[in-house]
């Protein structure tokens, strides 16, 4: 009888140990194509530049409704409407022959690819292709309705202060 109890307890102990030590099979993580996302972000920047250079900033679909843009020497622009108004005021005050371009340097993608931080370089040139303003920027994109939109952005000129 004692032998049966000992065997039963030993069996119960071993089964409990096996259940406790059994590691769950993890599902393979979805493969995120960082280069493809970088191309997608660069395409958004190219579209933004083309729209801005055309003088039609009000049709920019780049920003989330709750976006915030941090500019140098200014209070943050809160909301898509305020950002577009700021961009329109810049278009009105700039030389119409100036053109802006953006280059995506790096992207940092979240594990689920729903957020992307972009680090890039911008350049504004005049009609003779001479740079009049250059600098760097960071943008936090979030995926909403299947598309990346800018939620937060900031930029800094690397031109000397005049």
Where does each model-flagged region fall?
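Bacterial Sec-dependent N-terminal signal peptides
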Residues: 1-32
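Short, low-complexity N-terminal intrinsically disordered segments enriched in polar/charged residues
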Residues: 21-62, 162
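A solvent-exposed, acidic/Ser-Thr-rich amphipathic alpha-helical stretch
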Residues: 35, 40, 56-114, 121
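Polar/charged side chains located within well-ordered beta-strands of beta-rich proteins
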Residues: 45, 69, 90, 104, ...
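A short, structured loop/turn motif at beta-sheet edges
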Residues: 107-115, 129, 142-148
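Generic short beta-strand segments
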Residues: 119-125
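Sequence/structural signature of outer-membrane beta-barrel proteins
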Residues: 125-127, 159-160
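Short beta-strand edge/turn micro-motifs at domain boundaries
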Residues: 134-161
């Amino acid at each position: 009888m004692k032998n049966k109890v000992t065997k039963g307890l030993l069996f119960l102990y071993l089964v409990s140990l096996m259940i406790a030590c059994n590691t769950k099979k993890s599902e393979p993580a979805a493969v995120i194509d960082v280069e493809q996302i970088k191309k997608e972000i660069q395409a958004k920047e190219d579209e933004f530049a083309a729209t801005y250079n055309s003088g039609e900033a009000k049709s920019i679909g780049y920003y989330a409704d709750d976006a915030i843009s941090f500019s140098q020497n200014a209070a943050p622009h809160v909301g898509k409407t305020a950002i577009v108004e700021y961009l329109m005021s810049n278009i009105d005050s700039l030389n119409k022959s100036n053109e802006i371009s953006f280059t995506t340097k790096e992207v940092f993608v979240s594990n689920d690819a729903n957020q992307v931080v972009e680090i890039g370089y911008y350049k504004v040139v005049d009609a003779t292709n001479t740079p009049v303003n250059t600098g760097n920027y960071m943008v936090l994109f979030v995926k909403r309705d299947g598309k990346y939109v800018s939620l937060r952005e900031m930029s800094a000129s690397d031109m000397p202060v005049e």
